[in-house]
């Protein structure tokens, strides 16, 4: 049983900060790499849940005959739930630790995913989609904090920037599985229910894989749990942190009111955080306003649709586009040592802007091949511009606020995604598909300008807190 002693609070904080700086500059072990992969794998589950519904919307519409607003809510509700989860999960993880939160969120997601198969009407589905977003948002904010605290400098940035690669894998996996169910002739009313509930399978696998993961030593340090922090530090970083006493100490809990004050006190943190919020908002709306509805856009434009009305060809075209996007997501982290975070963001948003403009003109003139080309350029760019916003928001934050910072950053992704998913169908009705596409391109341009004029180069950055 660990004993807790009371030392001078300022001295305890200095010891904790010294140990934190030591670990942030350490090389990780195979255990820390395993933990990073376990956390970033959450994106596979989110991608399945987010994109599976895009492929079965047409079947949900047939069963429930929803209004345009209800259909928009059914797709956007998960984003609203994730917004709530990102805020709550980040705060809870900073106060109570990473492991308790990431175990709890996976259990909740599994239960809610299965429940989707049994909804009776569109409002049941909307409510469940809202609720299922809460554990998703919570797990992302907590997972990014875990990655930044359990991996070595450079490696943690690359792992964090792999989220688009994992997102692409999840999307391609969902496309393949749903297409196979469609080809087998499964009843469409059953198909969409099974598709949504299947998200529980990878979530259960991930839950069991995480059970043996330790709490991060940095999170333990910030809560005064020095005995456990020394043990876990030895496991993850091969450093027993000899500067710390062998007793736990009492440390004050982090205050949410101090978070922005600390971020704003440092010009590097401030500029990086502002960029991360802008980038997350632009890429979140950019994706859900156009790429999320890509299957619908392709069907309505006649791309891949057979004379008999089969959408199998459309699904295959979409799968190929997302296979390309997955390659882009894999390449983006590899480019960080070469062109840095600014370069990745500028190239990403620039290509996304060009792809959307080209896609808009192609839709306007019914150039089917150019619609596909524009979508490919957009998705390659998007998987670069979306790769590092969450990483930047997390890496510049002090450890005691890191999950909170990740949560705040993810709020901008999900608020923009909710807006994009809900508004794009209405915008398409008002301006047409081409006009709506041109409107979305403005977001990519804003992201490019933010990367050019706001973002300082951060590759290799090691956080050091300045007093407000």
In which residue ranges do the predicted regions lie?
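Transmembrane-helix signature of 12-pass secondary carriers
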Residues: 2-468
